[in-house]
A protein has these predicted regions:
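Extreme N-terminal starter segment of soluble prokaryotic enzymes
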Residues: 1-3
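Rossmann-like NAD(P)-binding element
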Residues: 51-113
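Glycine-rich Rossmann-fold phosphate-binding loop(s) that bind the pyrophosphate
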Residues: 8-9
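C-terminal substrate-binding/catalytic lobe of Rossmann-fold NAD(P)-dependent dehydrogenases
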Residues: 133-139, 148-313
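N-terminal Rossmann-fold NAD(P) dinucleotide-binding loop
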Residues: 12-13
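Conserved N-terminal Rossmann-fold NAD(P) cofactor-binding segment
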Residues: 33-71, 300-306
Length: 313
């Protein structure tokens, strides 16, 4: 079984590394547009195989999509970071063009693949890939909620001094400031988190989660890569091994939660077919209001893409 990661930067290379270490696929292809870059990263990862004791083959390719043919899953991390002076619309146009080009070539060589988008702005780039791929929406989805939830759980584990393994949580909505936390659905070994932590402290952890990506940027001067790469690999594993895992995923909504024609983070079941079910939670009025506010923010950005010539539906 083959899995491809497009984009050999920090996130893509980390994803490939995790896939290899956990032997999630027999063959892992790392592809990048920069000459020799993916080959170098792939070789470096492969040279850890005798140390980490895995058999997954890791190879690199410079923009040769024929090497990706027959991939069960393709992770797309390609895109440029927002630079000083660059408007939001400029960033959307640039990265949508990149995602469109990549998606076209991915589908040409792997028409039955599932596509996991990691490129930012996440929700709208997933939409761009869906418009380009012209396949069922259950096969094109985005990684955001797995990362955001991992951050939330890790912060709670620090505050409560418990194992992060015992914390279960769900976040919904867009990736970023408009994400929707659901403390009612956050538990520690089945115990509601609201019984273990004061509301003020919980709210502070939620705010830290919303700004989690920015916190890393402020410390490093660049975006995170370990957690995003591992989060993408976890989604790939759920698909490849048909695990039926329940993950918050950027999915195409067609009436669920009263929302239509929008990519938004919601709980889903991930298995060999991609998104096998969108799970509708019973939200209270406050949670619904936050979700609709988040949806409106995402819809605004999607409309920016709709008004561009970058991608035609």
């Amino acid at each position: 079984m083959k899995v491809t990661v497009v984009g050999a930067g920090n996130v893509g290379a980390t994803c490939a590394d995790v896939l290899a270490k956990r032997e999630i696929a027999n063959e892992i292809v790392l592809l990048d547009i920069k000459e020799g870059f993916a080959e170098g990263k792939a070789l470096d990862i492969w040279e850890t195989s005798p140390i980490n004791l895995y058999d997954s083959r890791v190879t690199g390719s410079t923009n040769d999509y024929s090497k990706t043919a027959g991939s069960e899953v393709v992770v797309i991390t390609s895109g440029l970071p927002r630079k000083p002076g660059m408007s939001r619309d400029d960033l959307i146009a640039t990265n949508a063009g990149i995602v469109k080009s990549v998606t076209e070539q991915v589908i040409e060589h792997s028409p039955d693949t599932k596509i996991v988008i990691v490129s930012n702005p996440l929700d709208v780039m997933t939409y761009a890939a869906y418009l380009t791929a012209k396949v069922d929406s259950n096969r094109v989805f985005g990684m955001a909620g797995v990362l955001d939830t991992a951050r939330y759980r890790s912060f709670l584990a620090l505050e409560l001094n418990v194992s992060p393994k015992d914390i279960q949580a769900v976040l919904m909505g867009g990736h970023g400031d408009t994400m929707v936390p659901l403390p009612r659905y956050t538990t520690v070994s089945g115990i509601p988190v609201t019984e273990l932590i004061e509301t003020e402290k919980l709210n502070s952890i939620i705010e830290r989660t919303k700004k989690g990506g920015g916190e890393i940027v402020n410390l490093l001067g660049t975006s995170a890569w370990y957690a995003p790469g591992a989060a993408a690999a976890q989604m790939v594993e759920a698909i490849v091994r048909d695990q039926k895992r329940i993950f918050p995923t950027c999915a195409w909504l067609q009436g669920e939660y009263g929302l239509k024609d929008i990519y938004l983070g919601v709980p889903t079941k991930l298995g060999s077919k991609g998104i096998e079910e969108i799970i509708e939670l019973q939200l209270n009025s406050d949670e619904k209001e936050l979700l609709y506010r988040s949806a409106n923010a995402v819809k605004e950005v999607m409309e920016v893409l709709d008004n561009m010539d970058t991608i035609s539906a």
